[in-house]
Amino acid sequence: MHAELYRTRKRWYESAWPGAGFWRGANDTLPVTNYITYPANFDQPDGQSLTPLTMAAMMGNVKFVKTLLSHYDVDLDRECNVIYDGMVVYGATALWVAAGMGHLQIVKMLVQAGAAINHNTKAQSSPLRAACYEGRLDIVEFLIDNGADVNATNLFNNNTLMIAAYKGHHLVVKTLLQNGSRANDQALCGATALHYAAESGHLDVVVALLDHGATLKKNELGITPALQAAERLHEDVLEAFIERPELMSLEEQITALELLGATYANDKIKYDVNKAYGYLLRAMQLRYSNPRGVIRKRVQPTVPAYDNWLETENLPELYAIKLNHHSIHMESLAIRERILGRNNPELPQAIIYRGAVMADQGRFYQCQVLWNYAIDLRMRNNVSVDRDLLRFAQLFAQILRVENHNLTLDHVLPVLAKCQQEIENNKFKIKEAKPNACPSLWQDQNNQNCITALYLIKIVTHLARRKKDQNIDEEHIQQLFLVVRKFIQNDTRLQDGQTLLHIAVNGVMPVDEFYTNEMCRFPCYATALVLVHCGASVVAVDSDRNTPLHILVTKVNTTQDRQAEMARILELFVEAGAHLDAVNAAGQTAATACKLPILANRLHAHQNAHTSLKCLAARSIATNRLNFKGLIPTQLEAFIQMHSVRKVLP
């Protein structure tokens, strides 16, 4: 009976697709209603959990929906989990799905059948919001006419007007406004619909909102829609604000024009130094437009990363830098920081771009100063810096490749310390993740940071080998050991359980190809030596219970120089106390798993010479499957587990 129930449910599920023929009926020997109204637990590999009605609404299968509504007692408001625009939406009803997919006829059928028109998803998204997102004016009008709440908000207090404004659906915005949508409502972040329209550059939407009484409110970062438009380089939108003198004071206009010009001077896509200077000049002229009421700049303290640049404060000073692009760049970075503030997440991007340009020009030191400052800003605001850290590793590898002697430990060690701090921060986020958090994203970032850390340690070992050529003293060495010990003490690992030592001896680990490929090749004896010296365990196991020795002899790079490196690492591991008879989850020792005969012979020789009575006893217990859990001192349990295929310990 259970198998028959499953098969019939499956047939009804599949019949919801367009062109399916099963909609006409079902097995008469079983009550069809059971298969139509069953809970939405038909889980799919992609994360969806759907009823036949929801699937039919998703696919626009009008005939199937009509059959269900007219012949069966279906639950119209059954909540399902659906994939919409690449994301899983939890608690979506058939009406929400039909509205979001743009199936007007099905929307009408469901509403007429009694579907709750304001039934929200788990994130408090209504069917009207889904229709506004897609810009389906016909569905929006129908839902409003049938009682949809135009001012309904989601969990972030973001209403339907905001999403329509962000997406640039001009006619939908006008319809919402005409039906009572409040133009000046604010989301939890303080943003209004005008912020979203200005950010996206939708001039027609901005004008519609202004015509319906929208004002320039500040969000939680103190940014108005005018500043939002300026920071995103939407000149036409900013001019629309300026053309309405009741919206902005003269000083507010000046500030917005300065931000527009400063952003043009340091934007990756729309960089235009002439436009930048033009807007800065226009702003300065406005400051002095009334000789009796000059609007002075509120100049901030200088920033070392910007060459301690002091902003120009009058027209002669601005004229003096017209032909000096570097001065315009530094002026603009200082202006952006003054206007946006250090807590604004948009501030670092221009700094990173300017640093990248300097690196391309071979001005590596200035690049490092800017990038270090950008990382500090992001870490201060709890923003992930995994890409920034990788970018630094790439830069250091480039410097070593281009001008070998201009990189020192004073440059690399602070970045390595920041990498360690970022990994620690990520580990805390993953451990304390709330139900609505995204731990998989943090785990991906952690994986990247672990690999970047290894790149940096590898670069440090390269520099340390040139000790005679550099001023590398005991203080540098102690700084290195201190940071590496923190990595090890915090048990830094990839998602699959590999420690830094595992990664350091992995000969087939993918290496970033942007300069680091040439510099950071593995396995690396020097890197492994530093890790072991700082306390990395040679018997630590990953999720497949492979020790670093297993990884060394199975993840093999067959080039001749790498094989010699592997032999040195093998000897290092033996001296550090590696257990040669430790088995992985497949029951293999390093010797039995080894892919290179020359290394296998070495392993067998060492195994014969170094196997202890303690190891033999552990292997005997494992071979005979004797129960030892709780019967011996706890420190011995892990030792026996190392020699056993069965996983006994948690």
Swiss-Prot record:
GO molecular function: ubiquitin-like ligase-substrate adaptor activity
Domain of life: Eukaryota
Pathway assignment: Protein modification; protein ubiquitination
ANK repeat locations: 48-80, 90-122, 123-155, 156-188, 189-221, 222-244, 496-543
Presence of keyword GTP-binding: no
InterPro entries reported for this sequence: Ankyrin_rpt, Ankyrin_rpt-contain_sf
GO CC terms of this entry: ubiquitin ligase complex
Gene3D superfamilies according to UniProt: Ankyrin repeat-containing domain
The entry's keywords: ANK repeat, Repeat, Ubl conjugation pathway
Family, per entry: Belongs to the fem-1 family.
Known partners and oligomeric status: Component of a CRL2 E3 ubiquitin-protein ligase complex, also named ECS (Elongin BC-CUL2/5-SOCS-box protein) complex.
UniProt name for this protein: Protein fem-1 homolog B
Organism, as annotated: Drosophila melanogaster
Lineage: Eukaryota, Metazoa, Ecdysozoa, Arthropoda, Hexapoda
